[in-house]
Regions:
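Conserved AMP-binding/adenylate-forming
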Residues: 36, 248, 266, 289, ...
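Adenylate-forming
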Residues: 63, 108-117, 135, 229, ...
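Structural core segment of the AMP-binding/adenylate-forming
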Residues: 49-50, 77-150
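Conserved AMP-binding A3 loop
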Residues: 32-34, 169-205
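Conserved AMP-binding/adenylate-forming core of the ANL superfamily
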Residues: 3, 12, 20-65, 69-73, ...
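Flexible, low-complexity linker/hinge segments
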Residues: 1-5, 137-168
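Conserved AMP-binding/adenylation subdomain of ANL enzymes
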Residues: 192-228, 232-272, 287
Length: 391
């Protein structure tokens, strides 16, 4: 059977390469790649049995936890399209997102049941609802919600979903901070190349073979990645998919607590930490300054994306954590990574990240035509190649 650069296929290559390796950790819970495969297959079959069809939209309304990774993989295995739902949205924003995305199914944490109950009467196309228990007691049965693990238990564990396409759509909703959220539509192959590890970020060269990441996983011990931002953030989706494709281990936590971050790094021997600028870096610095007995020697990379990351905070982190590397990246839901700066102890500070100029960079005039070098015509910088297909 022909295999394309499809997200589900890429994850399955790693699952086959390292089935007994730990895929995801949250608190005291963890799943191996084989266990993740079993549960994701069951979820995919449950969704299909409930009438979810190829390219249907399935909302994911959860904080970072193991079930969110099961759901992400299960949704793409079913051929459906994931809709990232911001758990901070109020009912008006939820109503807009449910309607705008044409969502037909929803996976949500129980703590959001009251909001969901108030929105569903206006969004009757949302017909299948799975609820992840989180210790809260809101009533979800009033609108036909079914407990997550009970629902998927009856689903088949088999991987029998047929041929997939690189042209399948991955939908990445913007945060909606400057207006209504927009669903950025990426082909699976394109977002893999731009955000999910299909391009070497250092050289700009494509990963040549779809099995390369899985082969490397089998040949090397896993890196432990800890993305702090919520999964509604494209950066954490990126970090999680990259880890899954390459057989690495992802550590998640439902809430941000700076002291708990360092404790988690100590406990799980985290190698790569992902966060969003000063909003997270300042509390992390403050927690370190207070002092602790944590062994942080496993940590070698701290990566910030999509938010202001002040030079003074970078320098303080390097002072507290010498011999580490810090990266600061810019980008968006529409572009992926736009540029990265690297800071390390003993090196000259190069300032913030700058847009990378390479073979995918063009200048467009006011009519959208590509400007020829040396013509003297002014325009705007744009990116070509692996880009979204629209909103």
């Amino acid at each position: 059977m022909a295999v394309a650069l499809n997200i589900a296929d890429l994850a399955e290559h790693a699952i086959d390469a390292v089935p007994d390796r730990v895929a995801v950790i949250c608190g005291d819970e963890q799943l191996t790649y084989a266990q993740l495969e079993d549960k994701a297959n069951r979820l995919a079959h449950h969704l299909i049995d409930q009438g979810v069809q190829k390219d249907d939209k399935v909302g994911l309304y959860c904080r970072n936890r193991i079930e969110i990774v099961i759901a992400m993989l299960g949704i793409v295995k079913a051929g459906a399209i994931l809709v990232n739902v911001n758990f901070r949205y109020v009912e008006g924003e939820l109503r807009y997102l449910f309607d705008n995305s044409d969502m037909v199914a929803l996976v949500h944490e129980r703590r959001y049941a009251d909001r969901v109950a108030n929105v569903l009467p206006d969004t009757p196309h949302v017909r299948t609802i799975l609820v992840v228990e989180d210790g809260s007691d809101q009533d979800y049965r009033r609108y036909g919600g079914v407990e997550f693990y009970s629902a998927i238990a009856a689903g088949s564990p088999e991987r029998d979903f047929g041929e997939r396409s690189a042209d399948a759509i991955y939908l990445l909703y913007t945060g909606g901070t400057t207006g209504f959220p927009k669903g950025v539509m990426w082909r699976h192959e394109d977002i893999y190349r731009v955000l999910f590890g299909g391009t070497d970020f250092a050289t700009g060269e494509f990963v040549k073979d779809e099995y390369d990441l899985a082969k490397a996983a089998a040949a090397n011990p896993p890196m432990i990645r800890y993305p702090i931002p919520p999964m509604i953030h494209g950066a954490t989706q990126s970090a999680t998919w990259m880890a899954l494709f390459s057989g690495q281990t992802t550590v998640l936590a439902p809430e941000f607590n700076a002291d708990e971050v360092w404790r988690t790094i100590h406990k799980h021997k985290v190698n790569l930490l992902f966060f969003t600028g000063d909003a997270m870096a300042r509390p992390l610095v403050d927690a370190l300054v207070k002092g602790n007995d944590y062994d942080l020697s496993s940590l070698f990379l701290l990566a910030s994306t999509a938010a202001l990351f002040s030079p003074s905070i970078k320098e303080k982190l390097l002072e507290l954590l010498p011999n580490r590397v810090i990266t600061d990246s810019i980008g968006s839901s529409e572009t992926g990574f736009g540029g990265t700066s690297v800071v390390a102890a003993g090196q000259a500070h190069g300032g913030g990240p700058r847009v990378r100029i390479d073979h995918r960079t063009v200048v467009l005039d006011d009519d959208g035509n590509e400007v020829k070098p040396g013509s003297g015509v002014r325009g705007v910088i744009a990116k070509k190649g692996n880009i979204p297909v629209g909103y």
